[in-house]
């Protein structure tokens, strides 16, 4: 690069005298405006004090204001914000030039109207909620946003639709606490620049279409029936295993079956009934059917065979009995 070109570029980079004058006037304009506004404010304040002095003591009642314990007063003097928040208790204002707004610091509740929401699995549900919030910075809630309360209410509706739209129907029904916590965090982050603190969010009611309710009821009933069948099958399996084990044990002992048979007869005899039906051993019929020499079998009528069997039992157990075609009666 030639030295002449360097000099030309430096001259172009340096502002001209006219440009410096314009910049100086622009920079000095806010200072001059602030100076003029300060003089005007001082004059108005002085005239207000003179008016207060001339109308004393009537003007004292116009200067004294009271703020409740749960309120704070944000004061504007000639349209400018007074940095200090007033309250609670008594504070003084200058009539005609001071205005103030009372800000309630108590927790307010807002019932979010029912919102039609399309869940992530394309199911339309109606959900309503309740939001609890309060003002923690009175000045910011007045200066930072046009209407902090209404803005928070509108934001609660949009946040409810946005967050629930990212969840499935089963998650909405089962994870209400988690969804409420996510909604609280989202609202709190959005309203903090407005001087609003979100204390709590609760999903109050989730309503499903009638067709979806019937489908879910049928699914729940089918699930319960399937569970009951599984439990019954498992019970039968355990009972069968126990019976098989008992049969194996009894088969290994010759007297176990006889003892079990006697216990059963004892239990039946203790019942107050005139008719008792009990199993009849087929071995007795086999012994009775074989009559005569050479072991040749002869067929007897069933009634006579039963009577003969019962007579044999009488001789063994000395128990009086009568037989019928359907069974034995004691």
From Swiss-Prot:
Pfam families attached to this UniProt entry: Band_7 (PF01145)
| Protein location | Membrane
Give the record's keywords alphabetically.
Membrane, Transmembrane, Transmembrane helix
Start-end of Polar residues biased regions = 1-19
Region ranges (Disordered): 1-27
User: Where is it mostly found?
Assistant: membrane
Membrane topology label? Single-pass membrane protein
Q: Which family does it belong to?
A: Belongs to the band 7/mec-2 family.
Q: What is this protein called?
A: Stomatin-1
Q: What is the lineage of its organism?
A: Eukaryota, Metazoa, Ecdysozoa, Nematoda, Chromadorea
The UniProt gene name for this protein comes to sto-1
């Amino acid at each position: 690069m030639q030295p002449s070109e360097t000099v030309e570029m430096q001259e172009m980079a340096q502002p001209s005298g006219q440009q410096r004058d314009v910049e100086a006037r622009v920079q000095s304009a806010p200072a001059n405006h602030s100076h003029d506004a300060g003089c005007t404010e001082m004059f108005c304040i002085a005239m207000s004090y003179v008016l207060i002095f001339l109308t004393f003591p009537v003007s004292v009642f116009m200067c004294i204001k009271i703020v409740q314990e749960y309120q704070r007063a944000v004061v504007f003097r000639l349209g400018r914000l007074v940095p200090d928040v007033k309250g609670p208790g008594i504070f003084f204002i200058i009539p005609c030039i001071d205005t103030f707004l009372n800000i309630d610091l108590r927790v307010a509740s807002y019932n979010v109207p029912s919102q039609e929401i399309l869940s992530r699995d394309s199911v339309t549900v109606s959900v309503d909620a309740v939001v609890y919030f309060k003002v923690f910075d009175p000045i910011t809630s007045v200066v930072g946003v046009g209407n902090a309360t209404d803005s928070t209410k509108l934001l609660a509706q949009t946040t409810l639709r946005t967050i629930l739209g990212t969840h499935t129907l089963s998650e909405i029904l089962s994870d209400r606490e988690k969804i409420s916590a996510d909604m609280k965090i989202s609202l709190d982050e959005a309203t903090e620049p407005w001087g609003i603190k979100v204390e709590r969010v609760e999903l109050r009611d989730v309503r499903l279409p009638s067709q979806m309710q019937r489908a879910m009821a049928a699914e729940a009933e089918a699930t319960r029936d399937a569970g009951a069948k599984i439990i019954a099958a498992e019970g039968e399996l355990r009972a069968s295993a126990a019976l098989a084990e008992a049969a194996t044990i009894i088969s290994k002992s010759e007297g176990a079956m006889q003892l079990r048979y006697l216990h059963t007869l004892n239990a039946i005899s203790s019942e107050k009934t005139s008719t008792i039906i009990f199993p009849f051993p087929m071995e007795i019929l086999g012994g009775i059917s074989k009559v005569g020499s050479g072991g040749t079998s002869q067929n007897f009528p069933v009634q006579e065979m039963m009577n003969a069997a019962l007579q044999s039992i009488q001789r063994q157990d000395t128990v009086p009995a009568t037989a019928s075609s359907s069974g034995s009666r004691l």
